Every structure is written in structure tokens, then in C-alpha cells.
Curated annotation (Swiss-Prot):
Keyword flag Nuclease: no
Protein's name in the database: Exostosin-1
Reaction(s) the record says it catalyses: 3-O-{alpha-D-GlcNAc-[(1->4)-beta-D-GlcA-(1->4)-alpha-D-GlcNAc](n)-(1->4)-beta-D-GlcA-(1->3)-beta-D-Gal-(1->3)-beta-D-Gal-(1->4)-beta-D-Xyl}-L-seryl-[protein] + UDP-alpha-D-glucuronate = 3-O-{[(1->4)-beta-D-GlcA-(1->4)-alpha-D-GlcNAc](n+1)-(1->4)-beta-D-GlcA-(1->3)-beta-D-Gal-(1->3)-beta-D-Gal-(1->4)-beta-D-Xyl}-L-seryl-[protein] + UDP + H(+)
Organism from which the protein derives: Papio anubis
Function: Glycosyltransferase forming with EXT2 the heterodimeric heparan sulfate polymerase which catalyzes the elongation of the heparan sulfate glycan backbone. Glycan backbone extension consists in the alternating transfer of (1->4)-beta-D-GlcA and (1->4)-alpha-D-GlcNAc residues from their respective UDP-sugar donors.
Positions annotated with a glycan in the UniProt record: N89, N330
Tagged with keyword Chloroplast: no
GO biological-process terms attached to the record: heparan sulfate proteoglycan biosynthetic process; protein glycosylation
Record topology, Lumenal segments: 29-746
Residues the entry annotates as binding UDP: K267, K269, Y271, R280, Y319, Y324, R346, E349
Transmembrane segments: 8-28
Residue intervals annotated with topology Cytoplasmic: 1-7
């Protein structure tokens, strides 16, 4: 055996050597013949070898450096590999590689902050209503500037929403019109809005002109063409989508278990051929006519009968049996398959209806995906796994379904219910990219009240806002600052403002008192103010207008603010109790004087009433506690037009603050126990008696209500019948057993 192994090894080694000499000889002969040919051609003057003749030759020589955005403009002398050509042609945008760092000029934003300029409308140019709403939302926002030299971002007045050449809204010659703009600068620092692009039959994402280095806020954009941290994916919305406000979500109360009549529904067009037809043509395989109702119709377009298949008549009959709105209101999940384009109107319809969207649109970059975690509000499916959808959603636990439905309502109302919210969300995302050091985190974007109402310029710490105490495991503040608004001169030591100051200072929760002196008379001398155990700071209002009481003064060192009118009559016990209530509801207004609103059918407008009833929707800031963040929000979020109106009327600032807080929280204020004589005492004071009795004052407040509701786009105030009283309040027990016993004695 050992001898056989040795013979086998020797035979293998010999074979290897033979092969080596054979192939080596071929290469040697080839090189010799090649050298002879070179020598022969050299004698005939046909070849002059270079000094690096003996260096090896590589198939692709190193190319000189060329900036990426100049590759397509170079002549053919610069070699571009086939792979690079494919990459360049794979995108419809020449600025495929654009990112904020490479195609955005940050220096324009450092000087004046984030300001947006809208080009003036050119004469003779038609603008669709949807694009007019977008421009109006920008011009009505706090970001707008009419001075291009102050702008950080530029938006075209040319309508770029519909770039389908078959659409009547299509704007012709857009390429030359855009290039002629003197501020265009190859699209740098420009934002282009687009809902529809491409046309039959392939519906590409080409917008029909060179966008250069401009950002796209685009619906139905694919992940392939989406430029991360540069473009913004927006939802597809209809021309009827409201400009401001918008309807609230359909989830009025939480039903347990959170299941509805239908498990999964869809009702829409079916395309027999072409792009987007595969998924919708296959839906009938999943439809069972019971809890999974997926309805399609071929009955659309001019020539639908010429192209209909064997299922069309049956599908059309079944389609007519069901009401779409009824299905939405009674379904747990709503299928959102792609159409001709990746996006669909069904997406926003499902969100509003609290019907959990089941996405079937492979490659779609979901709206605002940069900041929204869609796994908390939707089920992301795969078109190739359509038949597995029913079993997948049936396996979702009821607790998860309830959480998904609740999140759909939050996202709808925070970012999608109006064109204004879609536009503002787009702008806020871009602003966060520019000022990364104060940008919002994922918790802010995906938790109530959302990114539009939490301004990072106020603070980068979540604990400074009234909405995140529970998330951070923090207790609400234990101290407050009393801010007394003084408008009448100090002529007597018995004036109500001095009694109020002493009562507030005696509170165990009071950290300091600030007197905002908005009186035309000079400041009183320091000895005129009573001595207190807490600091008393007197601030003279520079403008002496009503809105100045809500300025974010640096002197306010506590998160809680006790806002007081100079003629308010409160005891220390009442102040203490109101503050302990506020600690349980730090995001709301908590206080004493309550008012209400109503809809006047005869006048078709909102009405204001001060009648004492069991129903209220406002707590006036003449005696109320709230978080100081609302001072900042009032000053920086609300438009100057509303604040100017308040200042001119010297009225309605308390109503506007209630509008703001209710719009943010989606909750009513909280009324606490009030002494019986409060109304009579307050009305008897000389400083404001004339105001409350003045019919013009009341008419102004009626007018304010409607102006404010018009700007918000809806009525944010919410009615409530809850009043919080101390434990054992009015109970037939000994007064000594009651903590806030003085309230009943008043």
C-alpha cells in the first residue's frame, strides 16, 4: 500500500510539472514573437516605445478628478465607466447625489434665521387652487418674508404641482420660465412642491424640467429616487383638502375591544393593464364578502368597455352594493394599494377614519418618513405577499390595534388634516436639518402634541415642556410665579391689587411675584408695595399693550405661572388649591372665571357668553395657572395679525390664549372651586366694572371669537362640565376635617 501511494504522488507531481512547462513555454513564445513584431515595427518607424513601456498595462487608467455634478457636462475625452453611466441614468434628477451638505447654502440661514420667500406671481400665469393653498400657507406662516435678501429658502410661484402632460393643470414651457428667474441659481436653496409627475403609460417621476440642486417636496416618490436628508415625501391630497384646520379624526371614543364590523376593506379602481395593475387585479383572491371586503371596478375611463375582462361585470355589481363611507367607519384595517402612482388618496382617508392603513406599495417612501415612525400607525405589507395579508392582520393583538388606531388620529390631526399642516411640517423638517443642534427628536414628532407645537428654539430639554413629565419620570414643578397685570395707578393702600399681592405671596407654593406695570402713570416708589416673604419684581411694559402680559420674560424662573388681573379677588387658600390641581394637569389652563362659546344658527357665527352655567369652554387668564411655555408659544407661534388685533382692542387676549392651549392639547381647561361672591365682588371693582358692563366690550369679544376661529380654520375650544372641588367640599362633616376649609367660609 505504501509503495502505491508513493507512485501516485510521483505521478501527480510529474503531471503538474509537465503542465507548468507547457503553459510557460506558450507564454514565453508569445512574448518573444510580440517583441520581434515590436522590433520589426520599430525599424520601420511605426512605434516609439515610451520610458514606462515595461510597466504593466491596466484596463482602466485612473481618471482625473471631476466634480460629480459636472460629469454629464464633460466631453467624451473623460472616460465614464458603464456602471457610472447606469447610475447616472437610473435617476430622473441630475442632482441625484444632492444632500444638504453639498447642495444647500447654510450661510443664507445664519443671518436672519429660517425665512421663506415666495416669488411674486407672474402676470398671466394660472395657479391651481391646491397650489394657491400651499403658497397661502407659507405666506401666512411665521417663516414668511417678502424680502428675498433675508430668505433662507425660496419657493416658486409657478405651479409645479401637476406635471402630467395630459392634465389641464399642466404648465407649459416651465423649463425656460424657471431658468429665467434671477434668483434661481441652479435651484440652490429652492423647494419645489409636486403631487403628480409623468404620464401614460409609464408614469415616471420626471417633473418635466431640470430642478438642478432644488429640494423636492413630492408625493408618490420612490425610495430609489428619494434623496435622503434632502427631499421631503409628502402625502397625495385632493383639491378639496382644506387649506386650514380640517376635520378632526373619526375616533370619538376608545372601544374595547377595538374591532369593527369589517376586518379589512378597500374600494377603488382596478386597472386591467399597465403599471399598477398587478396588485389591484389580484385583490379578488383575498375578498371573502364577509369581514374582508375588497371591491374594485373597471368602470372608469372612456374606453373601459373595450378593455373589460370576464370579471368586470361581476366586480362592478359587487362594487355598487357597498357605501364607501360606511365601510371606512366600520373597518379596523384599510388596504392602501398603489395605483398608477405609488401614492393614493386612500392613505389620508384611512388615517382620518382611524382605520389602520395596510400599505401595499413597494418602494414608496412614506410621507414625512424622516420624522414619523409609521410602524406605530400602519402595517407595511408587500405586494408579492398579498395572500398573507389577512392572516397577518388577524394575528395582531387587540392592544396593538388600539394603539395603532390612536396613533392614526394623532398623526392625522397633527400633520395631515389640512394643506397648511402639510406645508408647515415640510418646512419644520427642513428647519431641523439646518439647525441640527436644536432639532426635534423622534419622541417629539411621534407623541402628542407633535412637532408643530413644540418649538425647539424654546429649549432642547424635554423637561422644560409641559407634555413630557410622565415620559421622563418627572414630577410637575412645586413652585409658581405670580404675574399681576396692573393697568391703573396706585393711589391707595386699600386697592385690590395690593390685597391680591399679599394673598398670593402667602401661598406656600409661591416663588416670586412679578407686577407688569402697563399703566400710563410712572412706577410707584418701592415703599408703596407691601412687604412680603417672597421677591416682588416690578416690570414696566415698554409697549404697554395687552399682549405684553404673555411675553416670555426671563424674570419668570418657574415653569408654572399664576396669571392675575389687578382686580381679581382671591384668597391664599384658593391659590393653593388651584396650584395643586394644576400639578395634575400641567399642560392645561386651570383657574376660576369660566366662559363658554356656542354656535348661533340665526347669525351663522360663533357666540360668546358669560352666563354662569354648568358648561364652559374657557378659563379666563385673569385668575388662572398655566405653564410658562405658553408665553413663548403665544409670542412666537401666533401671527402678528391676531396679536395686533388684541392690542388695538385692548381686549380678547385671554380668549386667544384659550384658543391656543386648546388647539395644542385638544382638551378643555379645568375650572376649580370658586367662592360664591367672586362674580359680585369682581363686578363691583371700579377699575373694570365699566368694561364688563360695556356692550361694546362684549361685542368685541364676539368678533374676536370668529376672527380667531377663522385663522385656526376650526373651533379649537372644547366644552366641559367638570369642576374640581377639594375633598369633603360642602360635605356635612366638621370643618376641621377639611384641608381647604377657608374656601367654604368665604
Amino acid at each position: 500500500m505504501q509503495a502505491k501511494k508513493r507512485y501516485f504522488i510521483l505521478l501527480s507531481a510529474g503531471s503538474c510539472l509537465a503542465l507548468l512547462f507547457y503553459f510557460g513555454g506558450l507564454q514565453f513564445r508569445a512574448s518573444r514573437s510580440h517583441s520581434r513584431r515590436e522590433e520589426h515595427s520599430g525599424r520601420n518607424g511605426l512605434h516609439h516605445p515610451s520610458p514606462d513601456h515595461f510597466w504593466p498595462r491596466f484596463p482602466d487608467a485612473l481618471r482625473p478628478f471631476v466634480p460629480w455634478d459636472q460629469l454629464e457636462n464633460e466631453d467624451s475625452s473623460v472616460h465614464i465607466s458603464p456602471r457610472q453611466k447606469r447610475d447616472a441614468n437610473s435617476s430622473i434628477y441630475k442632482g441625484k447625489k444632492c444632500r444638504m451638505e453639498s447642495c444647500f447654502d447654510f450661510t443664507l440661514c445664519k443671518k436672519n434665521g429660517f425665512k421663506v420667500y415666495v416669488y411674486p406671481q407672474q402676470k398671466g400665469e394660472k395657479i391651481a387652487e391646491s397650489y394657491q393653498n400651499i403658497l397661502a400657507a407659507i405666506e401666512g406662516s411665521r417663516f414668511y418674508t417678502s424680502d428675498p435678501s433675508q430668505a433662507c429658502l425660496f419657493v416658486l410661484s409657478l405651479d409645479t404641482l401637476d406635471r402630467d402632460q395630459l392634465s389641464p393643470q399642466y404648465v407649459h414651457n416651465l423649463r425656460s420660465k424657471v431658468q429665467s428667474l434671477h434668483l434661481w441659481n441652479n435651484g440652490r436653496n429652492h423647494l419645489i412642491f409636486n403631487l403628480y409627475s409623468g404620464t401614460w403609460p409609464d408614469y415616471t417621476e420626471d417633473v418635466g424640467f431640470d430642478i438642478g440642486q432644488a429640494m423636492l417636496a413630492k408625493a408618490s416618490i420612490s425610495t430609489e429616487n428619494f434623496r435622503p436628508n434632502f427631499d421631503v415625501s409628502i402625502p397625495l391630497f385632493s383639491k378639496d383638502h382644506p387649506r386650514t384646520g380640517g376635520e378632526r379624526g373619526f375616533l370619538k371614543f376608545n372601544t374595547i375591544p377595538p374591532l369593527r364590523k369589517y376586518m379589512l376593506v378597500f374600494k377603488g379602481k382596478r386597472y386591467l393593464t399597465g403599471i399598477g395593475s398587478d396588485t389591484r387585479n389580484a385583490l379578488y383572491h383575498v375578498h371573502n364578502g364577509e369581514d374582508v371586503v375588497l371591491l374594485t371596478t373597471c368602470k372608469h375611463g372612456k374606453d373601459w368597455q373595450k378593455h373589460k375582462d370576464s370579471r368586470c361585470d361581476r366586480d362592478n355589481t359587487e362594487y355598487e352594493k357597498y357605501d364607501y363611507r360606511e365601510m371606512l367607519h366600520n373597518a379596523t384595517f384599510c388596504l392602501v394599494p398603489r395605483g398608477r402612482r405609488l401614492g393614493s388618496f386612500r392613505f389620508l382617508e384611512a388615517l382620518q377614519a382611524a382605520c389602520v392603513p395596510v400599505m401595499l406599495s413597494n418602494g414608496w417612501e412614506l410621507p414625512f418618513s424622516e420624522v414619523i415612525n409609521w410602524n406605530q400607525a400602519a402595517v407595511i405589507g408587500d405586494e408579492r405577499l398579498l395572500l398573507q395579508i389577512p392572516s397577518t392582520i388577524r394575528s395582531i393583538h387587540q392592544d396593538k390595534i388600539l394603539a395603532l388606531r390612536q396613533q392614526t388620529q394623532f398623526l392625522w390631526e397633527a400633520y395631515f388634516s389640512s394643506v397648511e399642516k402639510i406645508v408647515l411640517t415640510t418646512l419644520e423638517i427642513i428647519q431641523d436639518r439646518i439647525f441640527k443642534h436644536i432639532s426635534r427628536n423622534s419622541l417629539i414628532w411621534n407623541k402628542h402634541p407633535g412637532g408643530l407645537f413644540v418649538l425647539p428654539q424654546y429649549s432642547s430639554y424635554l423637561g422644560d415642556f409641559p407634555y413630557y413629565y410622565a415620559n421622563l419620570g418627572l414630577k410637575p414643578p412645586s413652585k409658581f410665579t405670580a404675574v399681576i397685570h396692573a393697568v391703573t395707578p396706585l393711589v391707595s393702600q386699600s386697592q385690590p391689587v395690593l390685597k391680591l399681592l399679599v394673598a398670593a405671596a402667602k401661598s406656600q407654593y409661591c416663588a416670586q411675584i412679578i407686577v407688569l406695570w402697563n399703566c400710563d402713570k410712572p412706577l410707584p416708589a418701592k415703599h408703596r408695595w407691601p412687604a412680603t416673604a417672597v421677591p416682588v419684581i416690578v416690570i414696566e411694559g415698554e409697549s404697554k399693550v395687552m399682549s405684553s402680559r404673555f411675553l416670555p420674560y426671563d424674570n419668570i424662573i418657574t415653569d408654572a405661572v399664576l396669571s392675575l388681573d389687578e382686580d381679581t379677588v382671591l384668597s391664599t387658600t384658593e391659590v393653593d388649591f388651584a396650584f395643586t390641581v394644576w400639578q395634575s394637569f400641567p399642560e392645561r389652563i386651570v383657574g376660576y372665571p369660566a366662559r363658554s362659546h356656542f354656535w348661533d344658527n340665526s347669525k351663522e357665527r360663533w357666540g360668546y357668553t358669560s352666563k354662569w352655567t354648568n358648561d364652559y369652554s374657557m378659563v379666563l387668564t385673569g385668575a388662572a395657572i398655566y405653564h410658562k411655555y405658553y408665553h413663548y408659544l403665544y409670542s412666537h407661534y401666533l401671527p402678528a395679525s391676531l396679536k395686533n388685533m388684541v392690542d388695538q382692542l385692548a381686549n380678547c387676549e385671554d380668549i386667544l390664549m384659550n384658543f391656543l392651549v386648546s388647539a395644542v392639547t385638544k382638551l378643555p381647561p379645568i375650572k376649580v372651586t370658586q367662592k360664591k361672591q367672586y362674580k359680585e365682588t369682581m363686578m363691583g371693582q371700579t377699575s373694570r366694572a365699566s368694561r364688563w358692563a360695556d356692550p361694546d366690550h362684549f361685542a368685541q369679544r364676539q368678533s374676536c371669537m370668529n376672527t380667531f376661529a377663522s385663522w385656526f380654520g376650526y373651533m379649537p375650544l372644547i366644552h366641559s362640565q367638570m369642576r374640581l372641588d377639594p375633598v369633603l367640599f360642602k360635605d356635612q362633616v366638621s370643618i376641621l376635617r377639611k384641608k381647604y376649609r377657608d374656601i367654604e367660609r368665604l
